[in-house]
Design a protein with these regions (language model features):
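An N-terminus-focused feature that recognizes amino-terminal "leader" regions
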Residues: 1-23, 141-148, 234-236, 269-273
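Conserved short histidine dyad/triad with adjacent acidic residue
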Residues: 1, 146-154, 165-180, 217-218
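Asparagine-centered strand-capping/turn motif at beta-strand->loop junctions
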Residues: 42-43, 222-225
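Contiguous mid-protein beta-loop-alpha structural module that forms a pocket-lining wall or clamp
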Residues: 36-93
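Short, surface-exposed secondary-structure boundary micro-motifs
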Residues: 36, 216-217
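A short hydrophobic beta-strand segment most commonly corresponding to one strand
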Residues: 6-8, 32, 46-66, 187-188, ...
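A short, N-terminal "cap"/entry segment at the start of jelly-roll beta-barrel domains
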Residues: 77-162, 248, 259-274
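A short beta-strand-loop-beta hairpin characteristic of the jelly-roll/cupin
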Residues: 1-29, 33-37, 180, 184-207, ...
């Protein structure tokens, strides 16, 4: 189908076949499915395989264009310059000094293609880098995380064009500074315990819990208890909102919000912490 997916494995092992790539995965690995890429999952391990999949299918269903094919036949790539590729592209040209331009139809139906690859973020590799963030001091005001970045999304900061996936380490006793943003977030906690405050209400969570942790524009923060660190996967529709110029973000509730991607964003005190 035309959905762009992000997947993670909750338990078990297996192989994701995405296009012409085979991706062997283990627990907590993350990978993506480019839109329209033929894909299937195989449980070639000895245990039950449980996966979480995040996709834009719901949005496409609301648009009434959610198209899915079962057992599709692989298509042959069209020959360059053939009828299917539409020939050459015409250049857009400016009509004033501010940048308003006109683009010919030949380019409208043949935009510059950018390959979309299946990518894999093994948890073992990600964790080795993530654990280094656990040593940042308590005075740090940012989040101890890495975005699983797909370079195809460029400045839109995505794992797919619609979503980002981040992995967070939360050392014992860390309480985040409250903030809010238009983008919505879903957290999957897979190690440790803690709580979240969302619009003034407290929610307790533990490893294995899945939570809509930040509805759009809801003030929220998260905290870990003192006994052990937390690992969590967050899925958020930030890239889509950046592209729509709708990503209003308030990192500090005492300061004005900003539209990320259109205006300058925020800074942390990372350089001043150890």
């Amino acid at each position: 189908g035309q959905i762009g997916d992000t997947g993670t494995i909750v338990t078990g092992t297996g192989t994701a076949h995405v296009g012409d790539r085979a991706i062997p995965f283990e627990r907590h690995d993350v990978w993506n499915h480019p839109a329209y890429a033929i894909h299937r999952h195989v449980n070639d391990g000895d245990d039950l395989q449980v996966r979480l999949t995040y996709s834009n299918a719901a949005l496409l269903e609301m648009m009434r264009v959610h198209l899915v094919e079962e057992d599709p036949v692989p298509e042959q790539a069209p020959e360059p310059g053939g009828h299917e590729t539409g020939g050459g592209r015409g250049e857009a040209f400016a009509i004033d000094e501010h940048g308003a331009s006109l683009m010919p139809y030949e380019t409208l139906i043949n935009p510059q293609p950018v390959p979309s690859k299946a990518l894999h973020w093994p948890w073992r590799t990600v964790k080795s880098h993530l654990d280094e963030l656990g040593g940042i001091g308590q005075e740090y005001v940012g989040r101890r995380l890495y975005l699983l970045y797909n370079p195809r999304t460029e400045r839109f900061n995505g794992t797919t064009p619609n979503f980002f996936a981040t992995m967070t380490i939360r050392p014992p006793g860390i309480v985040d500074r409250p903030h809010r943003h238009v983008s919505s977030a879903i957290n999957y906690y897979f190690h440790g315990t803690g709580y979240s405050r969302v619009e003034g209400r407290r929610y307790e969570w533990k490893a294995g819990d899945l939570m809509v942790s930040a509805p759009g524009w809801a003030v929220h923060n998260h905290a870990s208890y003192d006994d052990e660190q937390v690992y969590e996967l967050t899925i958020q529709d930030q890239p889509l909102n950046i592209f729509m110029e709708s990503l209003l973000w308030q990192e500090d509730l005492a300061a004005p919000p900003r539209i990320l991607g259109t205006s300058e964003g925020f800074a942390t005190n990372r350089g001043a912490t150890s």
